[in-house]
Amino acid sequence: MTDEDGVRAANSAFYAALEARDLDAMADVWEHSDRISVTHPGWPMLRGWAKVAGSWDAIFRNTGYIQFVLTDELVTVVGDSAWVTLDENILQSAGQTEAADELSGSKATSVNVFVRDEAEWKMVVHHASPVSAEG
């Protein structure tokens, strides 16, 4: 597997964990350190594994359904660091409902940063910014 393939696999695992709302799978994707950060759309930046994990737990508890269609994906690898830039096209429900008539769509542009930890790529930054319908 090439480095680019490894980063793509780690990035795919991140979105699979997010769609499944699986905190254990999400924990497997991330480096557990104080240097990591996450910025969810509309949230302040959170640093450190405890705050990052807490944010995913809150999102998972308050989301009934979420699906991502990723577009304009570009993977860049430089040594033991890599980043993925992409657009997230999101279909989700408000609250815990999974009813089709409760779904809404949105879009965010994202940067996911990974570092190589021995043979694995681990996420250290996820930053997602909302994109307006006009943008």
Give, region by region, the residue ranges found by the protein language model.
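A beta-strand edge to alpha-helix "cap/lid" segment located at domain peripheries
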Residues: 1-25, 31, 35-135
